[in-house]
């Protein structure tokens, strides 16, 4: 992977351990261009979509990170680096007694100097809540890797419906885990989906900056 890519973006999808290691089905499901379906496979094709990318695929990501590659995961996709041990002491959590219909809420940036936030003028900005594990539980060793947290409280709900907003106060939703695996590589994780259905335009730069500045870090902080 590293010979072809510096950065891999894993968009919102189910890549849990169970899904990744799932065996192919007895009956293949092709995704390929045919005379009937001429526009399939324009950006990729496979003779069988069933099953996960398996142990071989996991090992390929492991080698990618050990070689200094950067993995960016959003929403449910963060389960992949976390469940396979590529994210150090970062784990997912879903705060109790919170009900929300994807409202806009306030977030606070923990490190304004981080390249992910290039172009952001204020430390507090609006974000789309939901579409993932919602928050991260971060170990002491990675506290300084937290990039942003929820402000929390009903006053932080800018639009939409949300009960229990006080229960997300101070919870981390963006983390830069580096070095990520065996002292190498980088895993940038967003518990929300910064590119949800082309709606939350103000958050797109979180992903763009992560890609463009994959090998940069705040001044004085080393990157492998």
Which sequence ranges carry the predicted segments?
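Stable alpha-helical elements in mature extracytoplasmic
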Residues: 57, 77, 112, 203-207
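Acidic/histidine-enriched alpha-helical segments
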Residues: 1, 223-224
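Helical hinge/lid and interdomain linker segments adjacent to catalytic or ligand-binding clefts
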Residues: 1-87
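Catalytic beta-strand/loop cores that center a nucleophilic Ser/Cys/Thr
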Residues: 82-200, 215-223
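Active-site beta-loop-alpha substructure in enzyme catalytic cores
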Residues: 210
């Amino acid at each position: 992977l590293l010979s072809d890519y510096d950065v891999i973006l894993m968009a919102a999808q189910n890549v849990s351990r169970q899904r990744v290691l799932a065996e192919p089905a007895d009956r293949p499901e092709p995704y390929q261009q045919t005379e009937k379906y001429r526009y399939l496979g324009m950006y990729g094709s496979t003779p069988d979509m069933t099953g996960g990318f398996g142990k071989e695929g996991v090992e390929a990501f492991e080698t990618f990170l050990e070689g200094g590659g950067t993995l960016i995961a959003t929403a449910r996709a963060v389960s992949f680096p976390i469940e396979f041990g590529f994210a150090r002491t970062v784990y997912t959590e879903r705060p109790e007694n919170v009900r929300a219909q994807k409202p806009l809420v306030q977030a606070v940036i923990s490190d304004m100097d981080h390249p992910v936030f290039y172009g952001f003028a204020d430390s507090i900005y609006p974000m789309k809540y939901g579409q993932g594990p919602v928050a991260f539980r971060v170990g002491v060793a990675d506290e300084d890797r937290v990039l942003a947290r929820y402000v929390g409280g009903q006053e932080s709900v800018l639009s939409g419906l949300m009960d229990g907003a006080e229960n997300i106060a101070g919870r981390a939703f963006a983390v830069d885990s580096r070095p990520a695996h065996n002292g190498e590589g980088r895993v940038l994780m967003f518990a929300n989906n910064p590119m949800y259905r082309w709606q939350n335009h103000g958050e797109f730069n979180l992903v763009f900056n992560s890609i463009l500045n994959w090998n940069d870090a705040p001044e004085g902080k080393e990157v492998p």
